[in-house]
């Protein structure tokens, strides 16, 4: 299934979503505290670091990066021109380099960056192992990669909807992809928005690894299987519609629990 786990379909998905991404999506599903907790794993402790943000979208994660690193040393990469156009309007990101590109075939030389960050992009990658191998390739020895993404659901309905939408990997899959690419010193932490309830499955993961050696990834990567430029015909258009509907089902859930949490806080203040 995973109707949006395809580059062309994801491109169309974000053509629509980009119009309200910062206003409606991030406040529900990818908040500033989540972002900051994830970026802590990246050791962005030197303003002179060269940082690549893959699947950067409208620049929400990039905004957290440039709070720690000089903007002119940061590169945003995304396949969606609509998302990047939104990012270009943000004053804090004016000096950031912005490129269209493919996470599975990064348009950079080997060992070009000190840090690699990708948040909320892996779920759209047809071949996550290839993309993480590319992260290893473009990092210099001693560099760190941070990948943030959703985790597999155990509830039957939530799992059916998420699997119809896009990729929700298991935690051990994230670890295996990092290790197979050659990353060591793996660190991970769970991240979740305020409305996510204790006792539920872990919402998402931030996982980081370090590249110790020079050279190619430990696991040779196959060529990309598809491109965002592939034609979106009737079958793919149907998949796009079904996947979008499955993803939209999560929005009222998030809104409901967000409202409950705010009412609870308001009641405590009275």
Regions found by a protein language model. Give the residues of each.
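Conserved class I S-adenosyl-L-methionine
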Residues: 1-44, 60-64, 83-86, 243-267
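Conserved beta-strand signature within the Rossmann-like core of class I S-adenosyl-L-methionine
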Residues: 143-149
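Short, glycine-/aromatic-enriched active-site segment of Class I SAM-dependent methyltransferases
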Residues: 150-166
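A short glycine-rich, Lys/Arg-flanked "PGG" loop and its adjoining helix->strand segment in the class I
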Residues: 129-141
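A short acidic, Gly/Pro-enriched loop at the edge of an enzyme's catalytic core
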Residues: 104-115
């Amino acid at each position: 299934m995973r109707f949006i786990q395809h580059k062309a379909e994801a491109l169309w998905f974000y053509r629509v979503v980009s119009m309200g991404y910062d206003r409606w999506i991030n406040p529900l599903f990818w908040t500033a505290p989540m972002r900051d907790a994830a970026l802590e794993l990246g050791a962005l402790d030197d303003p002179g670091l060269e940082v690549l943000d893959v699947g950067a979208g409208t620049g929400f994660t990039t905004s957290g990066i440039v709070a720690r690193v000089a903007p002119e040393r940061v590169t945003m990469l995304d396949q969606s021109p609509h998302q990047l156009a939104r990012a270009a309007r943000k004053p804090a990101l004016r000096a950031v380099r912005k490129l269209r590109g493919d996470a599975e075939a990064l348009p950079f030389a080997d060992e070009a960056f000190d840090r690699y960050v990708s948040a909320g992009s892996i779920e759209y990658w047809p071949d996550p192992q290839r993309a993480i191998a590319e992260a290893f390739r473009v990092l210099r020895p001693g560099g760190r990669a941070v990948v943030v993404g959703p985790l597999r659901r155990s509830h039957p309905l939530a799992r059916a909807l998420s699997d119809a939408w896009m990729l929700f990997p298991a935690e051990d899959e994230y670890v295996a992809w990092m290790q197979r690419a050659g990353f060591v010193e793996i660190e991970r932490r769970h991240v979740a928005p305020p409305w996510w309830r204790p006792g539920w499955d872990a919402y998402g993961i931030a996982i980081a690894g370090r590249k110790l050696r020079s050279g190619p990834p430990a696991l040779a990567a196959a060529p990309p299987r598809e491109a965002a430029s592939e034609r979106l015909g009737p079958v793919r258009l149907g998949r796009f519609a079904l996947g979008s509907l499955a993803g939209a089902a999560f929005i009222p859930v998030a809104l409901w629990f967000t409202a409950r949490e705010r009412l609870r806080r308001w009641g405590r203040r009275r």
